[in-house]
Amino acid sequence: MEERDRTGRTGQPQHRINQPSTARERANSVDAYGFQRSDDFDYETHEQLMSEYLAVLTRRSIRWAKLLQGRRRVDRNLKVKRYVRKGVPNEHRPLVWMVCSGAQEQMDRNPGYYQSLLDTHHEPKLEESIRTDLHRTFPDNIYFRKSAEPCLQQALYNVLVAYGHHNKAVGYCQGMNFIAGYLILVSKDEETSFWLMEALLSRILPDYYTPAMLGLKTDQEVLGELVRLKAPAVWKLMQDQGVMWTLVVSRWFICLFIDVLPVETVLRIWDCLFYEGSKILFRVALTLIRHHQQEIAEAQNLPDVCERFKRITRGAFVEDCHTFMQKIFQEPGSLSMATVSKLRESCRARIIADES
């Protein structure tokens, strides 16, 4: 009979399974969307945030499933708007984005159109511009590497070349590759990505990507006017230092916060962008600036201003996407579409006058 010690255990050696002792060891070095995490990624904070956010995701998933009930339609009402603001589960994003943006209606009206664009003769200049940017698009994402099976670079090329033929006034410009890449990662479907891109570039954000980029320039100036009203200390700093808004926020707008904010935070912003329109971009930008206005206002020179604008897009404030999304509807205060439209009108006129 085996001898036991005073605790009741036998004298046999204990075989222990080595359990990961740190958050870094417990977590994957690649996130849910295929992006390689950086060397300085804060695994401890991420683990803490995800332990809370996973519970939120589970609740949202149950409520969305009950709301949709297997239907391929999404109503426009206060309840759905509230649901969208609280986050669309990833499994429902393609459907919700397509329906809410009007992209589904456009696709249904034009069966076979996407394939016809791929079958047409491709303009050499368009092809060359797109191919040049393919390897620069998300090199840190395992699904866009040439070794991936399938490699999403081909899907990305198809969507971009199709859009270039569809909208010849725009063709292709840098920034569009990142937007198309995110759409492909979420929808996992080329044609869906094409129609979502058409909704974004043609209707939600008109003139952002045309050669003159008048819409983009206008909205950067509109942000400046909103900062003057809602974060005057930052506006004064920008005036005193002679810093143009395009220098610090152009990437926010042209890439729709891709590679600026964390992936899940960007997708939560896009949930609202597809449902509520471009006004959401101003809410995000104003929240980042207002929340950090004291830090920004202490900048001493131009490089310091630029560095502080980079710094405010990192850290726990933006990593906690659920709390951040609540903040964007609180921190900037009232922001009506009528106000945005009026500011756009005056800023656009000023830009045209300055450039003529």
Curated annotation (Swiss-Prot):
Alphabetical list of PROSITE patterns matching this protein: TBC_RABGAP (PS50086)
Keywords noted in UniProt: GTPase activation
Gene3D superfamilies in the cross-refs: putative rabgap domain of human tbc1 domain family member 14 like domains, Ypt/Rab-GAP domain of gyp1p, domain 3
UniProt biased composition (Polar residues): 9-22
Cystine bridges: none
Name of a matching Pfam family: RabGAP-TBC
InterPro entries reported for this sequence: Rab-GAP-TBC_dom, Rab-GAP_TBC_sf, Rab_GAP_TBC_domain
Region (Disordered): 1-29
An example Gene Ontology molecular-function term: GTPase activator activity
Residue ranges annotated for the Rab-GAP TBC domain, each copy included: 87-277
GO CC terms, sorted: cytoplasm; plasma membrane
UniProt keyword annotation of Chaperone present: no
Function: May act as a GTPase-activating protein for Rab family protein(s).
Protein's recorded name: Growth hormone-regulated TBC protein 1-A
Organism lineage string: Eukaryota, Metazoa, Chordata, Craniata, Vertebrata
